[in-house]
Amino acid sequence: MFKIMKDFTEQEKIIVLDFGSQYNQLITRRIREFGVYSELHPHTITVEEMKALNPTGIIFSGGPNSVYDKDAFRADERIFDMGIPILGICYGMQLMTTHFDGKVERAKDREYGKADIHVENPSRLFAGLPTDQVVWMSHGDLVVEEPAGFEVTATSPSCPIAGIADEERLLYGVQFHPEVRHSVYGNELLKNFALNVCGCKGDWTMENFSEVEIAKIQEIVGDKKVLLALSGGVDSSVVGVLIHKAIGDQLTCIFVDHGLLRKGEADQVMATLQGEFNMNIIKVDAKKRFMDKLAGVSDPEQKRKIIGNEFIYVFDDEANKLDGVEFLAQGTLYTDIIESGTATAQTIKSHHNVGGLPEDMQFKLIEPLNTLFKDEVRALGTELGMPDAIVWRQPFPGPGLGIRVLGEITEEKLEIVRDSDYILREEIKKAGLEREIWQYFTALPNIRSVGVMGDGRTYDHTVVVRAVTSIDGMTADWARIPWDVLEKISVRIVNEVDHVNRVVYDITSKPPATVEWE
């Protein structure tokens, strides 16, 4: 039986140090796929802080710097002396090499893309893998002399030292990126590191995660009360059920109908969470309040801030009617934390659960999902006994339709998005594609175009259909929806939604785009 670990340090885990690679979150995600808990930390972490985490293994990510740059990212060198396994990837391998007095130089030509490597010495890292394999390279420097005590484990035509290992000290490095899907046996290599080198059992599951989180919530909250920002989306709904299992009626859910919800959403949320789970939900009609604040505002960042601030002020108003409320719960995910920026990465956009809170907020935050990716949240919801109708609902941002209407928000524009999105969801479900497509929705860009309807000229709105496939939301590809399904969606939207004469399909992946338009 799983032992509830109130002390987080008891849990086996692999820490990924962030040196600025665009792929570092993928490393964390891949390790978790093997049933091993992993999380990302800045490269500035001290050895004392690292010891407090009690990691089973450490991975140094890649990064854009050269190890010889004046301002290159460094790690606390004492981490190398902790006596636990370390894997350096790309820049991480070069950092390990220079620390142990090996030699790194600028490559004559930068190498980006697929490459063939030959495994010279399998070591534990390459155990059971083919001698020749395709990997993904992305580097401008390379190791030209391995440190004393290390062996060369892999080579490639343009990178004579593509892998190194010191088996005695359990130190390993690879010049390529095993976390990227283009590295054909990358997953197997990372699994070797996690299970064979680090000795992890691979028993991290949503069952033990929920038990640990329930125990933590009970310990943190005690006999106090918690307010939950219930948006109606998957994340906040799962948070609500998790916290309700931990503290029961000490949880009060504040469901704010801000006028930015999907069609029929308010009624569905109340019927499911209040009716089936007997949760205490206060519904607040704040449509006019939000629309007044958003009037004339076009900038997406400003809209996010206004919506985030107004949410908190609504909660303040409701909290004043309750006694003993000290905590605010949110459905912040790990991807939200990462996308809102770390010490080594540029902020992509301030997230509604991360960067939209006022400085004078009166509550302590509880974010029990902030170490999980979206697919893990769905798995947790299923583990908690939630119905598929909630667990597999389409992801919905905290600012709601406020960021799916580009530019200024009006009632007319909101109705267009509501009705078109409803049609899209109906047709995707009819086609049996709702589990195959990770996320799909409509958005209203601030674009009007000329059209012909009946015998007359029109000058009306354009609706964008956005649909992507993904595993965890960190990267995404546009979904290949069959043409006949797209045709049905387009015909219905143009004919059934007022003031729309054009439908376009977004075929951009993430990156370079994000999933949402704002």
Curated annotation (Swiss-Prot):
Gene3D superfamilies documented for this protein: 3.30.300.10, 3.40.50.880, HUPs
GO cellular component: cytosol
Catalytic reactions of this protein: XMP + L-glutamine + ATP + H2O = GMP + L-glutamate + AMP + diphosphate + 2 H(+)
Residues reported in the UniProt entry to bind ATP: S231, G232, G233, V234, D235, S236, S237
GMPS ATP-PPase domain ranges (all copies): 204-393
Pfam families noted in UniProt: GATase, GMP_synt_C, NAD_synthase
Residue ranges of every copy of the Glutamine amidotransferase type-1 domain listed in the record: 13-203
MF terms (GO), sorted A to Z: ATP binding; GMP synthase activity
Keyword Acetylation: no
Coiled coil: none
EC number: 6.3.5.2
Broad enzyme group: ligase
Keyword ATP-binding: yes
PANTHER family in the cross-refs: GMP SYNTHASE [GLUTAMINE-HYDROLYZING], GMP SYNTHASE-RELATED
Subunit-structure text: Homodimer.
Record-given protein name: GMP synthase [glutamine-hydrolyzing]
